Amino acid sequence: MANETLTALPTDEDVAFYRENGYWISPPLLTDDVLQAAERGMRRHHAGDVDRHIAREPKGSFGGWTPADGDVLRKNDGASLRVDELALLVRQSVLAGCAARLAGADEIRLWHDQLLYKPSGPRRQANVGWHTDRRYWLTCSSERMLTAWVPFHDIQEEHGPVMFVAGSHRLDTGTDLDFFDQDLSTVDRYAAEHDLRIVSATLTRGQVSFHHCRTVHGSGPNRSGEPRRSLAVHLQPGDNHHVAARNPDGSVAGHHNDRLTARPDGTPDYADPAVCPRLWPPAA
């Protein structure tokens, strides 16, 4: 394990902050070379230039945005499984090492990732609605899952940074929040009622923000004059596994990983190395 990775891991104070507030913003972790490669990977993915297709994925089922959708908020799931430059970013051991420290986990595996592109412009429908990641992961046994949000460039207020409701992971926030909801006013009231702070994650290039799966988060419009470009890397502790669950409306809960990781008998294997590779500890 490289000394650089060890020295970059969160301190005890950082871990305590994360567990109290539900998020943590790292010092610079990633090199320009890795982020420049990720930018190339994003352009390739958006152009349909991929290194491989995902096994057991019905064509187009999980890919998300395509050029036919126009210049809107773009979200593409599983991008690192298709494009090598994005896999390089996801497999940076310092990301999973930080996640392991924050979650108190001996092992970290990829859950899935999302390539995110938010166009600039005040009239665009490009808010990311207030939501918790846990809302979409009801079939996961672990409550310690977390996300590393990796921007490819400096993020200032005008870019529409990720915003966290600090401490919301410790409360019952409900399950009716939605990623694509353009109304961000409801959580202002929620935060005021529970005496919680809303924090914006402004970062310099190379920094990463981490948040707990139950932390309420979202982002506002991008007014920077350039698209906001990033990768959300969703991570699971090694002991996470599939559980039967239902949505609030009573329907059976599921996740696209259920199909991608299905065993011969149909049950999902969230440790399938082809879809959910181990990222920490790093390979010898």
What are these regions (language model features)?
Residues 103, 133-145, 196-197, 203, ...:
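A short beta-loop-beta micro-motif enriched in histidine and acidic residues
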Residues 3, 40, 48, 59-60, ...:
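Non-heme Fe(II)/2-oxoglutarate
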Residues 118-120, 165-172, 228, 234-240:
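Short edge-strand/loop segments of extracellular domains
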Residues 122, 126-130, 140-141, 158-164, ...:
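A short secondary-structure junction signal
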Residues 2-20, 27-130, 136-139, 177, ...:
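Non-heme Fe(II)-dependent double-stranded beta-helix
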Residues 16, 155-216:
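Double-stranded beta-helix
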Residues 138-157, 202-203, 210, 234-237:
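Short, conserved beta-strand element in jelly-roll/cupin
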Residues 114, 132-134, 150-154, 166:
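Short, structured patches in soluble enzyme cores that scaffold and shape functional sites
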